[in-house]
UniProtKB/Swiss-Prot annotation:
Matching CDD domains: RecA-like_FtsH
Gene from which this protein is expressed: ftsH
Cofactor(s) the protein needs: Zn(2+)
Record's protein name: ATP-dependent zinc metalloprotease FtsH
Family: In the central section; belongs to the AAA ATPase family.
Topological domain ranges for the Cytoplasmic compartment: 1-29, 172-706
Membrane topology note: Multi-pass membrane protein
Gene Ontology molecular function terms on file: ATP binding; ATP hydrolysis activity; ATP-dependent peptidase activity; metalloendopeptidase activity; zinc ion binding
């Protein structure tokens, strides 16, 4: 198929997707409930406007006077009105007091030479002597019991019709089908999938940098969609479904769009949460409609983002499920079994919670292949930075390779945010180029939060923060297995951080030893120990340090088998990898006696870390005071100045001096970098998590006392 034919195919697919498919005639505007409401309102206006054209209204008192004068040929009495037909008047005839009304009837009250009937509003209730007056005058009269068909229409038919039309309009709006397919109340079961053709995606694999392995896996999908005979002649079967898993912000949606852009096929994109709404059975109907549309457009790609919202496990132990979601999932499973893989229909899903997906969804024949879209390494980060910096005017001092080295653990979305923040900072400062200073400030914003220049702290608290951060830096500097210190600051940042110690490694690492964990915990306790040694007591600013040190110790004892007392056993609850870095509901599978032993070992490890930190602080008290004094003077101290004050960092034998190490946190935080206090040790419950930049804060909790 030529490019022009593909383009034409794409244009046909973009037109109305009603029951008649492409080429369906446009809807008549009068079929819209809103149009009917306008027509009814116009009819009411016209009826009211012309209601009194054929009659002449007069006051009720004048009507009674004309009855007494026998001016009417006949009278009709209604529930709240009376109508009188005037007698024919010969030319020049006029009598007594009735002359004036008769002249009016002959003059301005004429139509086709006939006098118009007179109509007056009758006084309701008793005491009305109109009937007696009519009988006395000898005028024939009649009575109407009800309001006739007019009243029936306005009292009953019109309000009901307006209410039904308004309800239909509301249901149409709620169904979300305006401009997206067949309108009306029955459109709830229609899929909300948006069709993106190749010109619309505008993304190819060249835009998906830093995830080369994932691109290589998906290249097979592209080649199958372009040349399926290459695989069919050897008896191969392309996977029906591809599941993209990985942390947030790593480019899963971008990769799916790039796959469709490379293949040049229709791209159905929707979220898993769009299947389930207020009515039971809507989700299953939308699944059926989605696959019906996709089969007509094959070869094509159907991309379901946030698949966990739809495909959560049906296990009763997992909270949050209900019958509607289960029915929708069952329909999806049936549809994925039902379509023929040879038709060229590829299902792609994306999730960052693969551990909660239903096993039936992941079996071969449905989502055959899982592609990990992980955080990029140093080389990948550099490639991503170059893509996002293509339209940014960089200064001569900007080295993107150095920026990539200073951003371990950053996902693609975070790197895009860094470039954008740097450009905004340069524009705010009225610069012509984005310099290295803006990139460093942007990284610091992501790691530690925004500067709180308006937060004023007194001299006593400022001195405590200075010694606290100097304690963190000193212990980490003097222990061989701790991370190198990049920057120390006592400028308040974020929600509750009054200061921070920034540690940015130069390399990516994925394993930790027991010695590295012990030195990490000692560095965490360095701030609290420095406060005790200088001021005689700790402050609330060390609360977050204690939380993270305890978390590291507990994982060493319970998950990693690093406690001599308990031995090489794992007591943690293994539920599979979690890319969100948060724990669900934990179940304890050991006795109370073992739990008490775990608590004792955790306490022993934390106390050991505190003793080691205290030894370092006491041995190097002069260096601690020198850095604290420097912080009180200039507030921010870089690594080069720390080296001039203390000398080179103590490193383990066999390593390059000053070369840092990076380890993952015990539970990967939601943000790609450790922006909370002392996020600093261990790796995930099910294996090493991606490396993280470290920022130790004083006053980590947003507490007024901190």
């Amino acid at each position: 198929m030529s490019a022009d034919e593909k383009k034409g195919h794409g244009q046909r697919s973009e037109r109305g997707r009603g029951p008649g498919g492409p080429g369906t005639q446009p809807r008549i505007p009068l079929a819209s409930p809103a149009a009917w409401l306008v027509l009814i309102a116009l009819a009411i206006f016209l009826f009211r406007a012309f209601q009194d054209v054929g009659v002449r209204r007069i006051p009720y008192s004048q009507f009674k006077e004309m009855v007494r004068q026998s001016a009417f040929e006949r009278v009709v009495i209604g529930p709240d009105w009376v109508r009188g037909v005037p007698k024919p008047v010969e030319a020049g005839a006029a009598q007594g007091g009735g002359a004036q009304p008769q002249q009016q009837a002959q003059g301005e009250g004429e139509r086709n030479g006939q006098a118009l009937p007179y109509v007056a509003t009758r006084i309701p209730g008793g005491g009305d002597d109109l009937v007696q007056a009519v009988e006395k005058a000898g005028v024939p009269y009649d009575a109407v019991a009800g309001g006739g068909m007019g009243d029936l229409f306005w009292v009953w038919i019109a309000p009901i019709a307006i209410g039904l039309l308004f309800w239909a309009w509301v249901m149409r709006r709620m169904s979300g089908q305006l401009g997206q397919g067949p309108p009306g109340v029955m459109a709830f079961g229609k899929s909300r999938a948006r069709i993106h053709m190749e010109p619309d995606t505008g993304v190819t694999f060249q835009d998906a940098a830093g995830i080369d392995e994932a691109v290589e896996e998906l290249q097979e999908i592209v080649e199958f969609l372009k040349t399926p005979e290459k695989y069919r002649r050897l008896g191969g079967r392309i996977p029906k479904g591809v599941l993209l898993v990985g942390p947030p912000g790593t480019g899963k949606t971008l990769l799916a769009r790039a796959t469709a852009g490379e293949a040049g096929v229709p791209f159905f994109s929707l979220s898993g949460s769009e299947f389930v709404e207020m009515f039971v059975g809507v989700g299953a109907a939308r699944v059926r409609d989605l696959f019906a549309q996709a089969t007509q457009k094959a070869p094509c790609i159907v991309f379901i983002d946030e698949l966990d919202a739809l495909g959560k496990s049906r296990n009763a132990g997992i909270m949050g499920g209900h019958d509607e979601r289960e029915q929708t999932l069952n329909q999806l499973l049936a549809e994925m079994d039902g379509f023929d893989a040879r038709a060229g229909l590829i299902i792609m899903g994306a999730t960052n919670r693969p551990e909660i997906l239903d096993p039936a969804l992941l079996r071969p024949g449905r989502f055959d292949r899982q592609v990990l879209v992980d955080r990029p390494d140093k080389r990948g980060r550099e490639q991503i930075l170059r893509i996002h910096a293509r339209n940014v005017k960089l200064g001569p001092d900007v080295d993107l390779r150095s920026v990539a080295a200073r951003t371990p653990g950053f996902a693609g979305a975070d790197l895009a945010n860094v470039v954008n923040e740097a450009a905004l900072l340069a524009a705010r400062r009225n610069k012509n180029h984005v310099t290295r200073a803006e990139f460093e400030e942007a990284i610091e914003r992501v790691v530690a939060g925004l500067e709180k220049k308006s937060r004023r702290i007194n001299e006593r608290e400022k001195e405590i923060v200075a010694f606290h951060e100097a304690g963190h830096a000193l212990v980490s500097w003097m222990l061989p297995f701790a991370d190198r210190v990049s920057k120390v600051s006592i400028i308040p940042r974020g929600l509750g951080a009054l200061g921070y110690t920034l540690q940015l490694p130069l390399e990516d690492r994925y394993l930790l030893t027991r010695s590295e964990l012990r030195d990490r915990m000692a560095g965490l306790m360095g701030g609290r120990v420095a406060e005790e040694e200088v001021f005689g007591e700790p402050s609330t600013g060390a609360s977050n340090d204690l939380q993270h040190a305890t978390a590291v110790a507990r994982m060493m004892v319970r998950d990693y088998g690093m406690s001599p007392a308990l031995g090489p056993v794992s007591l943690g609850d293994q539920n599979g990898p979690s890319f969100l870095g948060v724990k669900g509901f934990e179940t304890r599978s050991y006795s109370d006696h073992t739990a008490l032993a775990v608590d004792r070992e955790v306490q022993a490890l934390v106390e050991e870390a505190q003793d080691r930190a205290r030894t370092v602080v006491r041995e190097h008290r002069e260096r601690l005071e020198a850095l604290a004094a420097r912080l009180l003077t200039i507030e921010v101290v870089e690594e080069d100045e720390i080296t001039r004050l203390w000398g080179p960092k103590v490193v383990r034998p066999g390593t390059i001096e000053g070369r840092g190490h990076e380890e993952s946190p015990p539970e990967t935080p939601n943000r790609p970098v450790a922006a909370s206090a002392d996020a600093s040790a261990g790796f995930g419950r099910s294996g090493p998590q991606p490396p993280q930049a470290l920022a130790r804060h004083a006053g980590g909790d947003p507490d007024p006392e901190s």
